[in-house]
Amino acid sequence: MRGILVANSTQLPIRPRPDLKVSRNANGADVVIAGLVEGSQGPTVQGLAPRAVKEAEETFGAPLVEVAIRAGGSTKIGSTVVLPWFGNSLVLVGCGAEGFDGESLRKAAGSGARAAADLSHGSSLKVAVDMGTVSAEQVRIAAEGALLGCYKVPTITATSNEPEISTVTIVSNARGAKPELNKARILADAVYTARDWVDAPANLLYPKTFAASVQSWCNNLSDVTVDVLDEKALGRGGFGGILAVGGGSAHSPRLVRVEYAPEGSTTTLALVGKGITFDSGGLNIKTAANMYTMKCDMGGAAAVLAAIGAIARLGLNVRVVAYGCLAENMPSGSGWRPSDVVTMYDGTTVENGNSDAEGRIVMADGLARACEDNPDFIVDISTLTGACMVALGNHTAGVMTSGAQAADTLLDASEAAGEDFWELPITDEVREGLHSDIADVKSSGAREGGAMLAAAFLQRFVTPGIDWAHLDIAGPAYNEASAHDYTPIQGTGFGVRTLVQLAAHMAG
């Protein structure tokens, strides 16, 4: 499959998904991945059949762990070394100290898969992950890491995107492994989908084609409905924020609403994602260097729309409503201006302080609309501020909430999912920075505390009494450095796993 067919016959490039299996042995694998663990007596190999280890050591003329260390292997999480293995290859990957946790296993499996993919040399490989997984949960985590580690940015060339790895087999005899393996497959597929969307060039992925691709992703899912509001429907509905941001582009904006409503569900989770398919900054135009990666500014919408597909496929017993607020922020004669006053969906008037602070504007319309679904918990997620990146770096996302209960719920879900968040406050002093002399509120203010200021703005559009969390994923959503563990370059799909885990917690 070369791509996802969308409404205008454009194909969005996608990454092929490897097959996923569980087996008691690694027979037939081109590459075997095992662990290097730091035990009380020094490094040891974790996984691999004892007979195979014995035969290999007879060939090497030394203990396998010694051979690995001499070749550059290490127990450091994610480090890899490749050795010959019965005519094929063995990847030994560092797992840390004995008794390592789930996230260490996920990272190690991802690192092993990336190292295995580098051995393909144009052919698709069958890979076995034999890391001593003894429980069904460990099987799921190892499978997640390995599948996510297989991902590479889809190419747009005359040749197809053939996968370096065609099959991933988790070696384990754990009881109940197959259902957990299916969970891993569904979750990885959702992360792949979010990555595919983020990686797609903005001339291929714009509001109309993004919406069409979401419809394809959600097609034929039980208890799922998809509604797309185009420019005319947005005008009739009073979505002034989305229309203002998208007004400068030849590609008109969209609001995508996806609802998953399983019979018998008693709780509702609302998800709102920023979907700026390209952010030039508008009339407050970005520099060339800061504009190049701005196809990624729809990472929040990608996360919520991919996540709801996974939630439905998992059959979780919770009602979920996801909103993708889609627009392209471009400068033109029809674009909005600094100092414009925009009337939002809920009637709030907003003075535009900077056309490059557009994400909060589309999100505000989405939040106000989502509150009408009477959710028990509402989460918005966006690549919102450079200020959050300055504060927390490229691997940690910021979370700001309505209170301790919402923060604890979100952080528990993120920890279980293996995604790193850090809570920031919203202070009264920060809120004062939103004052406008001519409108109800101003969209932006001082640079200091910019992440908190944006969160304070968004909270104005959340109905009091609803638990709310704002996730600023500007740092970890897009990787401009080298690939590491299960994280590829470019789109990471960050946030998908946390949102799915949150839904699972709410489903009980």
Curated annotation (Swiss-Prot):
The active site is at 286, 360. InterPro entries: Leucine_aapep/pepB, Macro_dom-like, Peptidase_M17_C, Peptidase_M17_leu_NH2_pept, Peptidase_M17_N. It is found in: Cytoplasm. Its cofactor is Mn(2+). Keywords: Aminopeptidase, Cytoplasm, Hydrolase, Manganese, Metal-binding, Protease. Mn(2+) 1 binds at residues 279, 356, 358. PROSITE patterns: CYTOSOL_AP. One of its GO terms (biological process) is proteolysis. Mn(2+) 2 binds at residues 274, 279, 297, 358. Binds 2 manganese ions per subunit. GO terms for molecular function: manganese ion binding; metalloaminopeptidase activity. Its EC number is 3.4.11.1, 3.4.11.10. It catalyses: Release of an N-terminal amino acid, Xaa-|-Yaa-, in which Xaa is preferably Leu, but may be other amino acids including Pro although not Arg or Lys, and Yaa may be Pro. Amino acid amides and methyl esters are also readily hydrolyzed, but rates on arylamides are exceedingly low; Release of an N-terminal amino acid, preferentially leucine, but not glutamic or aspartic acids. One of its GO terms (cellular component) is cytoplasm. It holds the Pfam family Peptidase_M17. Belongs to the peptidase M17 family. Presumably involved in the processing and regular turnover of intracellular proteins. Catalyzes the removal of unsubstituted N-terminal amino acids from various peptides. This is Probable cytosol aminopeptidase. It comes from Cutibacterium acnes (strain DSM 16379 / KPA171202) (Propionibacterium acnes).
